[in-house]
Amino acid sequence: MTSENMAILFEVLQYMKEFREKTFVVKVGGAALEKEEAKTSFAKSIVFLRHVQVNPIIVHGGGVEITRLMNQLGIKPLFKNGYRVTDEKTLQIAEMVLEKINKDIVLKINLHGGRAIGVSGKDDNLLLCEKDIANGDIGYVGKIRKVNSGFIEKLIAQNYIPVICPVGFGEDGTTYNINADVAAAEIAISLKAEKLIFVSDVPGVMKDGELIPYLDVRNARKLIEEGVVKGGMIPKIQCAVNALKAGIKSVHVVNGEIPHALLTEIFTLHGIGTMLREI
C-alpha cells in the first residue's frame, strides 16, 4: 500500500469515528437512480454507512419517472420555480410512481445486506402538511407543518434503514405531493441530523461549468439571486440554507452516477461534490 493510500485510509477511519451514531438524511433523486450501476452503488454505500454505525435515512424523489409517465399519457408536466404543478391526475401519477421507486430502493438495499423498510409520509402521521402557496396555487403540493420524528427514531432503534416516500396528508385527509428536497430538509431538521445529503445527477453546484466545492449561506443565496442556480437546483439550495440556519452542520450535493460518490464526499477531506456550511 502506498503512502498516499495510507493517508486516505487514515482520513476514512477518522471520519468513521467522528460520525459513529450520527444521523444522515440522504435525499436521492430519480435521475440519480436511472442506471442499474448507480442503483447498486447507492445501495452498497447506504449499507456501508449502517455497518459503520451511521444512521442513514433515505428520502427519495421520482421526478424523472413521473415526467416520463405523464408524457406517455399525453399530460404536459408544468413547473414553477422548480416545483411541480400538481393537479389531481398528476397527484395520482406521482403517488403510483413514488410507491414503485420506494419498493425498488428497499429491495436493492436489502439485497446487499441492509435492513431497509419503506414508509410513506402518510404512515403514522409522519408528514402533516398544509397546502403550499409560497409559489402561488400549484395544486396538491404540501408544505410540511410537522414531522413525527418519533416514528423514524423507533425504526432506527430497531436497526431499520427508513426509506421515505415524500407524500403527506392534511388535517382533512387531503393527500399532498411534497418536493423531496423539502421533505428531506424538514426531516433532517426535525431529527437534528448531522448531515443532509442530496444525491443528484450533477457533480454539485456549478458556475460557468466549474464545480463549486464549498459554499456558505450568503454566497448560496447570491447564486440564486444571480440566476446561476436555477431549475431543480433552486429547491435544493433553498432547503440547504434552511437546514443550515436550523442547525444542520453541513449539506452536501453529489453526483449519484459516480460510483460511491456518497462515501467519497463524506469520508475524505476534499470530497467530490459541493459542501455547504452556514459560514
Swiss-Prot record:
Disulfide bond entries: none
Domain of life: Bacteria
One GO cellular component term: cytoplasm
Gene3D superfamilies found in the cross-reference section: Acetylglutamate kinase-like (3.40.1160.10)
Enzyme superclass (EC): transferase
Keyword Nucleus appears in the UniProt entry: no
Species this chain originates from: Pseudothermotoga lettingae (strain ATCC BAA-301 / DSM 14385 / NBRC 107922 / TMO) (Thermotoga lettingae)
Subcellular location: Cytoplasm
Record-listed substrate binding positions: G62, G63, R84, N177
Lineage per the UniProt record: Bacteria, Thermotogati, Thermotogota, Thermotogae, Thermotogales
Pathway this chain belongs to: Amino-acid biosynthesis; L-arginine biosynthesis; N(2)-acetyl-L-ornithine from L-glutamate: step 2/4
Similarity comment: family membership: Belongs to the acetylglutamate kinase family. ArgB subfamily.
Job of this protein: Catalyzes the ATP-dependent phosphorylation of N-acetyl-L-glutamate.
Protein name as annotated: Acetylglutamate kinase
Marked site positions, Transition state stabilizer: K27, K236
Keyword Transferase: yes
GO molecular function: acetylglutamate kinase activity; ATP binding
Signal peptide span: none
Enzyme nomenclature, EC number: 2.7.2.8
Catalysed reactions, semicolon-separated: N-acetyl-L-glutamate + ATP = N-acetyl-L-glutamyl 5-phosphate + ADP
GO annotation terms (biological process): arginine biosynthetic process via ornithine; L-arginine biosynthetic process
Keywords: Amino-acid biosynthesis, Arginine biosynthesis, ATP-binding, Cytoplasm, Kinase, Nucleotide-binding, Transferase
